[in-house]
Design a protein with these regions (language model features):
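N-terminal Rossmann NAD(P)H-binding glycine-rich loop of SDR-like oxidoreductase domains
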Residues: 5-25
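N-terminal Rossmann-fold cofactor-binding loop
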Residues: 32-36, 53-54
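C-terminal active-site/capping subdomain that shapes the small-molecule cofactor and substrate pocket
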Residues: 241-332
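Active-site-lining helix/loop region of Rossmann-like oxidoreductase modules
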Residues: 8, 143-274, 284
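Glycine-/Pro-rich loop/turn segments that contact NAD(P) or position catalytic residues
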Residues: 77-180
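Conserved beta-strand positions in the Rossmann-like core of class I SAM-dependent methyltransferases
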Residues: 30-31, 96
């Protein structure tokens, strides 16, 4: 098994965490991106840098030579994901990204499922805090249930200082849906113009009850129903964190002191099952999620091939427990 893992967008905020995590896990990060100056800055720390652009397939092919896997950390994923998946398929290597964009993740399943399966490779979109972690928690909470009526994923963030990449990706998604909102109900994605409700969510102690925005839809509405029979998938965001999205963007920074709790409830008939994860810094925790995914793919610890969400391709409880250095878990 090769140890070289290409990271596209390596010099971005999440990308830097991914590079550090790869190195911590004994992998050799190959730094990919189109900004030569920023690549050179990271390469000065002893990494190999390869300039590549999603507009130039040849540059991507050259950049992936010798790589065992590709992690895409560069948004907007509506722009970067497809060219990079194409390059990964040509190179015959697995692809993992940290996309939170709902439409970009849906595109992965719609456009690449058959080709990735035919190639015998694995494409894992949304392998990050939004989309990946929630899917793993829902899958773990389901346990031996083969179906459920509803899955609820509530995000309790102490704050949310968005990166520039988060804001740009959000703008791209907003334009794609023409400013409308999206939810997963009745077994399908539905676009609407309804006002978002505010309600109280009973997060576990020590967080306790908090005001949340209902139907604050995240990538879980793509990942969860991609493999689980759950016709209603609803996500919620703490009202304070939602208001922070309008705050000025910080520059490059280290690990944030902001904390999070992800509270998952799965309901079937009159029964409810719950799984909870708590931790610190939603961007930093995306790195061990993505790198653990790559490690499991490269070591053959997968359950399927093709385009698959975290909960579909990995043993969800085992995966979550492997991140005990980064997450505190309940009900897993």
């Amino acid at each position: 098994m090769g140890r070289d893992v290409a990271v596209f967008g390596a010099y971005g905020h999440t990308g830097r965490f991914v590079v550090a995590e790869l190195r911590e896990r004994g992998y050799v990060p190959l730094l990919l991106g189109r900004d030569e100056a920023r690549l050179a800055e990271l390469a000065g720390a002893g990494f190999e840098a390869r300039r590549a652009s999603v507009d130039d397939p040849g540059s991507l092919d050259r950049a992936l030579r010798g790589a065992s896997a590709l992690i895409n950390c560069a948004g907007p994923f509506a722009v970067t994901a497809a060219p990079l998946v194409e390059a990964a398929l040509r190179a015959g290597v697995p692809y993992v990204d940290v996309a939170a964009e709902i439409e970009a993740n849906a595109d992965m399943f719609a456009h690449f499922a058959e080709r990735a399966r035919a190639a015998g490779t694995v494409v894992v979109p949304a392998m990050a805090f939004f989309g990946g972690l929630g899917d793993l928690l829902v899958t773990a909470a389901m346990g031996d249930w083969t179906a459920a009526d509803e899955a609820h994923v509530a995000y309790g963030l102490s704050g949310w200082q968005p990166t520039l990449g988060t804001l740009v990706s959000g703008e791209v998604s907003g334009r794609r849906r023409e400013g409308r909102r999206v939810r997963f109900t009745g077994g399908r994605l539905e676009y609407h113009d309804d006002a978002l409700p505010t309600l109280e969510w009973p997060f576990p102690d020590p967080v306790g009850p908090q005001s949340v925005i209902g139907e604050f839809t995240m990538a879980d509405v793509v990942t969860v129903p991609s493999h689980l029979d759950v016709p209603e998938v609803r996500t919620y965001m703490s009202a304070k964190a939602a208001s922070d999205l309008a705050a000025p963007v910080n520059g490059e920074r280290g690990r944030s002191a902001e904390t999070f709790v992800v509270d998952v409830r799965v309901r079937s008939g009159g029964a409810e099952r719950r799984a909870v994860a708590t931790g610190r810094d939603i961007y930093a925790v995306s790195a061990p999620l993505a790198v653990e995914a790559v490690d499991r793919v490269l070591t053959g610890r997968t359950r399927t091939i093709g385009v698959a969400s975290a909960g579909a391709v990995f043993d969800a409880p085992d995966f979550l427990r492997a991140l005990s250095a980064h997450l505190s878990l309940e009900g897993v």
